[in-house]
């Protein structure tokens, strides 16, 4: 059986680490405890967090015990990592609410009951111990172990000091609070490994140094890479903003479409980062995808697996059916209103009056599927226009109000792949 560290290396998930052979030796003696922190700086986690979440899952599947730490305290402070400006401070009640939501979001990924895995995951909130510290205790018991020179040398801090913005004492202290988390988890659970993104490396090593000074033991850190895109744009962002795990912020349909639209050049890396399939399964999938690139087998596998993980198999089935139906490969009438609304919002939706009913020519122009009425007439004459998957052959045809989907929508399609929606006004 492949050792977990070898699997992580094959997947490209180890960007930097402390002594891997020492970590391997610790893992070989029995299950270890590993943690990752998630700060509630927004009402939801986003797909950028999936690398760390799924790395915790891989450790649990290999028999180790994961701790998911939600930063109810650190979320009040703000991590300067990866930022050129100071974070806005959120109200404590808001942060507490976000922390609860994030705890719930982690449940589909980690087994907190022990029913699936031998080592049940643990959920903690660092406000539990940090919130009880007085300023004097913080400075005497924790702060005295940190040397300002070393803190200033951390790349995150150094970069901010070089900038016009600078760094506040609040954010400068963040690495001390994160280090305290590692120390507290070592004391409570004998946690010996912290994982995080490569932009967190300075914070990870600060925790290692604190534990060595206070407890006299050596612990470990493992940093995952920052996910990039071949086209140079930021991973996890769309024209509409971040891709969230919360279905109220990013619909399951939009979530699915994000992965379906993955650039062919990114698919092999993303499958290794995000899929729970093993090496043999992924290599077989990559070969199949390479033989028929047009079928987008890699994108479909990625989209279906991750949508199922995040939103459940039932919801994934709905969005797969809706996606097929929108492009003429399924029955539109069977798509539920909520799923259809999300799909059309993602595709592009315009509202039009139906008194009198709009002409298909005008709908094609209004939705942006063609640039002009003359182009719309040409598309219809050439047999390339569809309303609710029915071909339109009459250039003067109107959209029949009696055939609107759920009494509200019409799906307008040009050719095989250009789709938009029309919603009845009022």
UniProtKB/Swiss-Prot annotation:
Annotated ATP binding sites: 237
Span(s) of short sequence motif 'HIGH' region: 40-49
Gene Ontology MF term list: ATP binding; RNA binding; tyrosine-tRNA ligase activity
Domain of life, per lineage: Bacteria
Domain S4 RNA-binding: start-end pairs: 358-418
EC number: 6.1.1.1
An example Gene Ontology biological process: tyrosyl-tRNA aminoacylation
SMART domains xrefs: S4
Keyword Protein biosynthesis: yes
InterPro entries documented for this protein: aa-tRNA-synth_I_CS (IPR001412), aa-tRNA-synth_Ic (IPR002305), Rossmann-like_a/b/a_fold (IPR014729), S4_RNA-bd (IPR002942), S4_RNA-bd_sf (IPR036986), SYY-like_C (IPR054608), Tyr-tRNA-ligase (IPR002307), Tyr-tRNA-ligase_bac-type (IPR024088)
Record keywords: Aminoacyl-tRNA synthetase, ATP-binding, Cytoplasm, Ligase, Nucleotide-binding, Protein biosynthesis, RNA-binding
Binding site for L-tyrosine: 35, 174, 178
Pfam families linked to this entry: SYY_C-terminal, tRNA-synt_1b
Enzyme class: ligase
Motif ('KMSKS' region): 234-238
Catalyzed reaction equations: tRNA(Tyr) + L-tyrosine + ATP = L-tyrosyl-tRNA(Tyr) + AMP + diphosphate + H(+)
Known function: Catalyzes the attachment of tyrosine to tRNA(Tyr) in a two-step reaction: tyrosine is first activated by ATP to form Tyr-AMP and then transferred to the acceptor end of tRNA(Tyr).
Subunit architecture: Homodimer.
Similarity section: Belongs to the class-I aminoacyl-tRNA synthetase family. TyrS type 1 subfamily.
Protein name per UniProt: Tyrosine--tRNA ligase
Gene it is expressed from: tyrS
């Amino acid at each position: 059986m492949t050792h977990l560290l070898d699997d992580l290396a094959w997947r490209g998930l180890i960007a930097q680490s402390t002594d891997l052979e020492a970590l391997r030796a610790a893992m070989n003696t029995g299950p270890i405890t590993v943690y990752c922190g998630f700060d509630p700086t927004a009402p939801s986690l986003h797909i950028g967090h999936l690398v760390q979440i799924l790395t915790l899952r891989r450790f649990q599947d290999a028999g180790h015990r994961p701790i998911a730490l939600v930063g109810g305290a650190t979320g009040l402070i703000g991590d300067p990592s990866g930022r050129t400006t100071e974070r806005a401070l959120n109200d404590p009640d808001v942060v507490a609410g976000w922390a609860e939501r994030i705890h719930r979001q982690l449940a589909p990924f980690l087994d907190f009951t022990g029913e699936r895995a031998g080592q049940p995951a643990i959920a903690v909130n660092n406000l539990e111990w940090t919130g009880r510290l007085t300023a004097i205790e913080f400075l005497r018991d924790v702060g005295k172990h940190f040397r300002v020179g070393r803190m200033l040398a951390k790349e995150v801090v150094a970069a901010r000091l070089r900038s016009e913005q600078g760094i506040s004492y609040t954010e400068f202290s963040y690495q001390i609070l994160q280090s305290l988390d590692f120390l507290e988890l070592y004391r409570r659970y004998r946690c010996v490994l912290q994982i995080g993104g490569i932009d967190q490396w300075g914070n990870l090593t600060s925790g290692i140094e604190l534990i060595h000074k206070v407890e006299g033991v050596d612990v470990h850190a493992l940093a995952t890479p920052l996910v990039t895109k071949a086209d140079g744009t930021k991973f996890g962002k769309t024209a509409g903003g971040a891709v969230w795990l919360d279905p109220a912020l990013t619909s399951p349909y939009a979530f699915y479409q994000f992965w379906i639209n993955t650039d062919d050049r990114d698919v092999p890396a993303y499958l290794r980062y995000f899929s729970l399939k093993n090496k043999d399964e992924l290599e077989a999938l990559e070969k199949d995808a390479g033989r028929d690139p047009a079928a987008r087998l890699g994108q479909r596998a990625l989209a279906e697996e991750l949508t199922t993980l995040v939103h459940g198999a039932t919801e994934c089935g709905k969005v797969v059916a809706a996606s097929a139906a929108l492009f003429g490969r399924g029955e539109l009438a069977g798509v539920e209103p909520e799923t259809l609304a999300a799909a059309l919002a993602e595709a592009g939706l315009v509202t039009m009056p139906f008194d009198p009913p709009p002409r298909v020519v005008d709908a094609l122009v209004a939705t942006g599927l063609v640039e002009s009425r003359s182009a719309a007439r040409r598309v219809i004459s050439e047999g390339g226009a569809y309303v609710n998957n029915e071909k339109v052959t009459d250039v003067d045809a109107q959209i029949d109000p009696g055939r609107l989907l759920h009494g509200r929508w019409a799906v307008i399609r040009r050719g095989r792949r250009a789709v938009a929606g029309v919603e009845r006004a009022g």
